[in-house]
Amino acid sequence: MKASSHSTPVTVLTGFLGSGKTTLVNRLLKERPGTRFGLVVNEFGEAALESQLVESRRAP
């Protein structure tokens, strides 16, 4: 398999409960409407609260 010269920037956002991760993600989504984002949400627990708090936006 030939290696690609294309690179994709990746940012990993981590933090403690209540540190503002979801707030930051929602702010980025609002302030950069033309930017394409991919999110991986890793939730533990019975209720998927963070997924509900991250605003749903569809790519054009």
Curated annotation (Swiss-Prot):
Protein name as catalogued: Uncharacterized protein in trpE 3'region
Cited InterPro entries: CobW/HypB/UreG_nucleotide-bd (IPR003495), P-loop_NTPase (IPR027417), Zinc-reg_GTPase_activator (IPR051316)
Membrane-crossing residue ranges in chain numbering: none
GO terms for cellular component: cytoplasm
SUPFAM superfamilies linked to this entry: P-loop containing nucleoside triphosphate hydrolases
